[in-house]
Regions:
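Metal-dependent amide/peptide-bond hydrolase catalytic core
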Residues: 1-193
């Protein structure tokens, strides 16, 4: 969470206030334009999204005294969370904004390079779905795999299609759940034999 402070005041007297929405607009444009290409060729480029902005009292005649901003960053192993923090805070400082930041890293990216678990998953998916060209991808959302990977364990994520992920009426078909159950069972069987 980033808090950008201004000075609250009456909208009719802007010279007695400092609107953080106005003072931060150029910095926000620079922040959303940040780019971090993946250098490994195994991950999508890192992305930054503004997920929440809150400012104001709700009254139309009051200049807000603070703007709160939440960012969501999906980054590849080509950069670190500190790289993102330094870039964002550098922009805020460049624009001389009065800010405080409380950063939370929801999990570092990971990549399983061992083929044992990967091959078991690919074979199981092909066996259950009949799809022989299984796409391996590091794109997508954050999962609990980020907590397991640092232990040194192999991590492979197999899940449903995500065409409605985080949308209104998010849903997964029963058929997909049944196929996943069968795939998981086959992966376990292959690993135990």
């Amino acid at each position: 969470m980033i808090n950008i402070r201004g000075i609250q005041g009456h909208a009719a007297y802007p010279h007695n206030a400092e609107n953080p929405i106005h003072t931060s607009s150029e910095a926000l444009n620079e922040i959303v334009a940040l780019q971090w290409p993946d250098k490994s060729g195994q991950f999508p480029d890192s992305i930054l999204q503004v997920s929440n902005i809150q400012s104001g009292t709700g009254a139309h005649n009051v200049i807000p005294g603070e703007l709160s901003l939440k960012l969501n960053v999906r980054y590849s192993p080509s950069i670190s969370s500190q790289t993102v923090i330094d870039a964002v805070e550098g922009i805020l400082r460049k624009h001389k904004l009065n800010f405080s930041a409380d950063w939370e890293d929801s999990g570092a990216p990971f990549l399983t390079t061992s083929t044992t678990l990967i091959n078991c998953a690919i074979e199981s998916i092909a066996n259950v779905t009949g799809v022989n060209e299984v796409e391996q991808s590091t794109a997508g959302g954050t999962s609990d795999g980020r907590f397991i990977a640092p232990t040194g364990s192999e991590v492979v994520e197999v899940g449903p299609l995500n065409t409605s992920i985080h949308k209104v009426d998010e849903a997964v078909s029963i058929d997909e759940l049944e196929m996943l159950t069968e795939i998981y069972g086959k992966v376990i069987s292959k690993l135990l034999t």
